[in-house]
Amino acid sequence: MSDQAPEILLAHHLKALKLPTCLREHHKLARQCAAEGVDHIRFLARLVEMEMIDRERRMVERRIKAARFPAVKSLDSFDFSAIPKLNKMQVLEMARCEWIERRENAIALGPSGTGKTHVALGLGLVACQKGLSVGFTTAAALVSEMMEARDERRLLRFQKQMAGYKLLIIDELGFVPLSKTGAELLFELISQRYERGSTLITSNLPFDEWTETFGSERLTGALLDRLTHHVSILEMNGESYRLAHSRARKAKTRP
């Protein structure tokens, strides 16, 4: 057996076992451990730990990509002082994701620009980091996709996909009224997810104005009954979060 044969065989096995980090790092780590007098058991432990850490990072990246977030935003970058009515401790408690494990819902209410989407994205990011499947969409886009899927006779498959997320974030509910068919399709999806998965909705409308979006008091009442059975309400009333930060940035750039 040539001197290169064991190295070639090892590389082949590591590729077959799908251990790219071990393949990439084993030479460097072996030299480092030899210099430090580290035995083979500790060398293997370090190498496997590197693989595990890298694998988890890649899995988180895949979950974030699959979620289709419009932007990746964390709760760490959210200025809670700009929205004093928002309960910071409630949001940080929700970041533990136990409410998702319990299949509960969340609704963020407040005027446009108060940071509802940022908080929703932050909670979605944390869920991805904790190994949970997340989907993000706007209410208008979701309804449009469902109507298109219905016309193409793949609605059941699409609904199954949406119902399968541990957390489904529906942004901007109430920005535009829904058609009768669109409202019924959205109600059907939320009903399918009821006590099977968590749904986080952001809306610029208080509950008593949701009928304007759904066009039916009966449908709105039934929807709210399902959403609010187990729910966390995030009150986000106040001056526009985006406007306040825009003013702050301009103030910093002034001579």
Residue spans for each PLM region:
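Charged, compositionally biased N-terminal leader segments and the immediate start
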Residues: 1-22
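Extended interfacial segments that mediate partner engagement and assembly in macromolecular machines
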Residues: 55-110
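Conserved P-loop
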Residues: 86-164, 211-213
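Walker B motif beta-strand of ABC-family P-loop ATPases
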Residues: 167
